[in-house]
Amino acid sequence: MNPHLLTHETADDYVRGMARVTQLVAQHLAADAPSTGATVADLTPAVEGVDLDRPAADLDAALAEVTDIYLRDAIWFHHPSYVAHLNCPVALPAVLAEGIIAAVNTSVDTWDQSAGGTLVEQRLIRWTAGRIGFGEGADGVFTSGGTQSNLQGLLLARGEAVRRAGSDATLRVLATEHSHFSVIKAARIMGLHPSAVIAVPTDETGGMSTAALAAELDGIRERGETAMAVVATAGTTDLGVIDPISTIADLAAAHGTWLHVDAAYGGGLLTSLRRRHLLDGIERADSVTVDFHKTFFQPVSSSAIVVRDGATLGHVTHHADYLNPRTAVTPNQVDKSLQTTRRFDALKLWLTLRVTGADAVGEMFDEVIDRAHQVREVLRDDERFEVAVEPVLSTVLLRYRPKGVGVTEADSLNPRIRHALLDDGSVMVAGTTIDGRAWLKFTLLNPQTSLAHLRGIIETIATTGEALRAEDELDELRVTAGSRGSGADALAPRPTMAGVTR
């Protein structure tokens, strides 16, 4: 017997080990903050001090080590005071599915490796396509995330554009400055010139200006170039804005241009009973990105690229005699995917739909969108804060700017507030820059984050900002006193901020 491998002979060890691991994680789920505030400098010595050439004494010793180097200081996305990035608490059935996925270790690249897994993935793709509004000819494949899904969508767009135009010399991709950066990365990977991605101006809502898009498409045609793709975003990362998909679809169709909808964030609306209309027009897309590991509450990774015409997936097909020969009777998933070996991530979504249900998933997303609108109303009555735009999804951009704080000072102060909160660890918010101005960002994906939690976070931000301003004023007094020769003892000791470091 080999004691190191999972077999029927080590099944008892497997059960005991999994019990130990689940108990360990369960203990940490009760963390009283989303972060410990540990820094790279704090964690590096422990990680570098591990001798990877010498194994630990046993599983318990190895797990204690994992606790020291990772688990104790992990960032807990399920904590209600985590409102930073597009990270969600995960559905319990999906976590349980992860255990099955890892133990069986299926690879869903070819039929002979994954008969049942292939059928499950294909069924989920058809289900997602139906929710989008695609017809019987739709198809797709699970991917590692929105970046890969967007890359594949644009690869297919290029394949179609080259098929029609006969050349890739003057291909152009139209997106906005708020589109995900993976659009530009995809263009680079495909070897397109940096000028190939055209930033279409946005309107006052932050969404793509359809008048500007029409002008850009006309200009491309007049210059003899080829509009390879228009990328509409259903939920921008910074603003949570949904581009006007229906009108964009009209323009793309009029110019014979591939329409890719990046619904990595907003795709959760496909299960919403109250807000599905926000995705109207998505059924006219040629390809759609959906990140289940965002608004379907799935563990990373779980995403998909879904296309209206499955035949277009042929642009990424390559046959290998040892794996997926042209003579194969049954199509293999590798024929559609950029990856070869690929985890059976679809099982997580399957088990979630079978236990939790699609309606409940949609309601959880609706709840966090509700919360974004509620916190917007709180901020509307709070003169200490500004809000960038009205929320559409679950993102709220705010910044601390009380009376007496100028625009430039606010641009400096708000990133400092964020870093102070990050150092403390009790609250985690994100930050970004819009039109050259610094903003804090609430990205709400946890239904357990109540309005009371958010009111508390707002007060923590304000208190931290006040303390930082007090420090700045004291620094100025010290500089002034020093320039007058008052000596080091001219002022009282500097006050400290509870839970805030610089």
Give the predicted meaning of each segment.
Residues 128-152, 198-201:
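Short loop-beta-helix segment that forms the pyridoxal 5′-phosphate
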Residues 434-502:
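PLP-dependent enzyme catalytic core of the Aspartate aminotransferase-like
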Residues 37, 386-391, 429-433:
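Short beta-strand
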Residues 2-137, 422, 427, 449, ...:
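N-terminal entrance/gating region of PLP-dependent enzymes' catalytic architecture
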Residues 386-421:
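Conserved PLP-binding catalytic core of the aspartate aminotransferase-like
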Residues 149-311:
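Conserved PLP-enzyme active-site core in the AAT-like
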